[in-house]
Amino acid sequence: QDAIIDNLSYKETIKKYAKTGDLIFMDPPYIPVGKYEDFKRYTKEGFYEEDHIELSECVKELSDMGCHVILTNSNSPMVYKLYADFDISVIQTKRFVNSNAKKRNGEDVIVNAPPRYRKIVNYGKAVLPKQNKSFPSTRYMGSKQSLLQQIANATSSYKFDSVVDLFSGSGV
């Protein structure tokens, strides 16, 4: 009932809302790793290599200002280059868009960019609110259903009141 819906780019959203202590989850169009992959069509303007470079600079700035950023992407050499300053975990995933069931397995990464100028305090294990069950999971292209527990684990030591999925489409 108190929701605010803005139609802004991720840069405009960050400029308007990001503040020290925030947890920011980013699920941008992935860097293509296969011959037939083309995830830049998710937006009208496209999302190209230069956009990924700008996004990585934004993640570094957010971390420097005291935000904790969790970012997902494909397991691509470019991701390791762009986010070399941060921890990167590889996660086995399923793809439902390949006509060949044997080729539906993949690997994504979770980039963990903690706040750089804040003391980290463990407040205990995070429990997902019951509200999350009210939303259907996305069972399409970029579903993060299989990553929710890893994301919850990665953020369990941080206290926050809200989460913004800047590249929404995950259903949570």
Task: Please give the residue ranges for each predicted region.
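Class I S-adenosyl-L-methionine-dependent methyltransferase catalytic core
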Residues: 1-172
